[in-house]
Amino acid sequence: LPENVFAYDLRVNLQTGNWNILAEYAQKQQDPNEWNDYIYRKGYVAMLSTSYSKSGMSMLVQAKRSDNMGYRSMRRLPLSAQNTSYINHLPAFTMDHTYALAAHYPYATNPDGEWAYQAELTYNFKRRTLLGGKYGTKVKVNFSHVHSIEQNPHTLDNGMVQGSNGYGSAFWKWGDSKYYQDLNVQVEKKLLKDFKLNLMYMNQYYNKTAVEGH
């Protein structure tokens, strides 16, 4: 097994006017461990994020593909410590909920690999308009979708996956499993000087078997 695992990250951030574009690519070298069945496939994450903002409106569109990017300081851990020893952080491209019911099933990035997308639009209707009313109205729409990546198994001559490159994966192709999907519409409306109304519609899909393994 490799004694050291080299990793690097490249990031480019462009900003012009009201636009901001962020592109990032990270890769780790061969890192066989118990979570990837001791395969020698390299891991990587490619991410693109675009945002636009002006007075009263903002927009965000993101896409990310990760592949075999679980990265820990230990190759094996006891069952009581399976969620420890992470070196890298893989943020989820999903909305961070604050209300208890909506936050009941938070999503965590699948280190084996995934395609993740997120889009968000926020708009403030001005005061003293038909939809803004006396105090204005804020509307936010968020949509996120996370899907597995295609994985075509590679094996050694003896049929074993361990010690091989693990699998092949075409960059743009999805796998068979949808991990998570979330649609949220939020309306924030101030009715009186000291009284505000918050309304939210949520449609959430959570694949517990794929995400939690049970």
Regions found by a protein language model. Give the residues of each.
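Exposed, low-structure sequence patches enriched in small/polar residues
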Residues: 2-214
